[in-house]
Amino acid sequence: MSTFGYRRELSKYEDIDEDELLASLTEEELKELERELEDIEPDRNLPVGQRQKSLTEKTPTGTFSREALMAYWERETRKLLEKERLGACEKDSEQEEDNSEDIQEECFTESNSEVSEEAYTEEDDEEEEEEEEEEEDEDDSDDEDEEKQNSAASERPVNCEDGRSSSHVRHKKCSNAKNSENLFNGHDGKDTENLSFKSSAIHPCGNPTVIEDALEKVRSNDPETTEVNLNNIENITSQMLIQFSQALRDNTVVKSFSLANTHADDNVAIAIAGMLKVNQHITSLNIESNFITGKGVLAIMRALQHNKVLTELRFHNQRHIMGSQVEMDIVKLLKENTTLVKLGYHFDLAGPRMSMTSILTRNMDKQRQKRMQEQRQQEYGCDGAINPKTKVLQKGTPRSSPYTSPKSSPWSSPKLPRKSAPAKSQPPAPAPPPPPPPPPPPPPPPPPVIPDKKAPTRNIAEVIKQQESSRKALQNGQKKKKGKKGKKHENSILKEIKDSLKSVSDRKSEEGSRPSTRPSTPQRSLHDNLMEAIRASSIKQLRRVEVPEALR
């Protein structure tokens, strides 16, 4: 029934003219019809990725302009690059960012998407031409006038973009001027040094160190500056770092020198190595996150062979990889170093890593032993300072004992009448009695009695040797007798049974074994006696006996 109903519905459209329907459709409806037909039956000649209709074609919902956003991103990236290379001032950057944000907001709110696309395409061409002219002429006023004339005929978004381009040009000129002031060429002498001071004094990082003042303090050997911290000062030049290392050669106060993330290179590392050979006061050095290669690191390691004070060295996270050869050379150079305790570097190879840990543990153990020795010496020194007082007290303390001793001891009675005549108030005279106590120490002489006991041991050894020689003679005689008996009873079965019951020593003697180098053992034993009794007896003569404890 369903098929009949479906055919009836189709029969309604048999009389309809398709050409008239297509002629009555509008352009939008025709486009929609084409899309539907493409979805139903796509073109087989197209690749699979292009047969599906585009699902990203949507009408813009706001006043967004892609070209304006791309131009803004390009300007920001240029600003960041200029800041990294030249070290632009913080104030100028903040003002320019505020101006660019205001201009960007106006452009986004006042420009339509379609109009802005056409306008910005024209603006891009104009900006390129203007920048080329500005680079050649370097005249700000003429460029601004040309921008105003070119933008007068265009719409407001064009004016907005021209304003932004002019601000960008101003920023570029300002940065070029700063570049000419701050760059250090190395050919200007004192003027270039002053310019380098200006460039390094102004830095956007969070390090509050003033480079000029710090360098002056290091050169003047200021007793208050025990640490020089130049971390994260990115716009400091390598020449300034070399000057710091040269100033530290004669400094005797600074204990810590750190210049992490300062773009230091091998030249700075070589200067630091020369400083470490001379300076014997710096205990901590930090050169992490720089551009130092294996050449500079090895130069510092060679300098440590002449330095016996540095205890901490950090050079991890360099721009260039050290490599396996450099790591092995580092370990070789630090084998003889006995002061380095902390090393801030992660070795990639397991061999150098393990050997370096053993070196550091060895150095820590040596320093611990030194501390223990110093403590002991201090304790002994304190005891030595106290000993004279104790001796005086000991001399004074026995004076209290003689007061009671003369009343009872016979020694003091004859001495009192002799010394009582010159002065009665001289009880210290009995001080000699303390020597009598030393006689008790003579009991230690008993240890010499030990050598008296050794004398009889020699006699015992001689007796033992005589006994062994007699036993050997007996054994040799027995061996000869047993050999004769064995020859007589070779063919008898009874002899084989008896041989099976013989001991190992008897078998070896019969077979003519070589004499052993070991000391001779007693010939007869309980086992041998038992075996002889068994051989000489018969079954009738045997009787039951208890097994001795030695054989249980």
From Swiss-Prot:
One Gene Ontology CC term in the entry: striated muscle thin filament
Positions of region (Interaction with actin 3): 526-545
Molecular function, one GO term: actin binding
Alphabetical keyword list: Actin-binding, Coiled coil, Cytoplasm, Cytoskeleton
Basic residues bias locations: 478-488
SUPFAM superfamilies named in the record: RNI-like (SSF52047)
Bias kind Basic and acidic residues: ranges: 364-377, 489-513
Gene3D superfamilies: Ribonuclease Inhibitor (3.80.10.10)
UniProt key word Coiled coil: yes
GO BP annotation list: actin filament organization; actin filament polymerization; muscle contraction; myofibril assembly; pointed-end actin filament capping
Coiled-coil annotated spans: 13-46, 86-151
Protein name as it appears in the record: Leiomodin-2
Gene source species: Gallus gallus
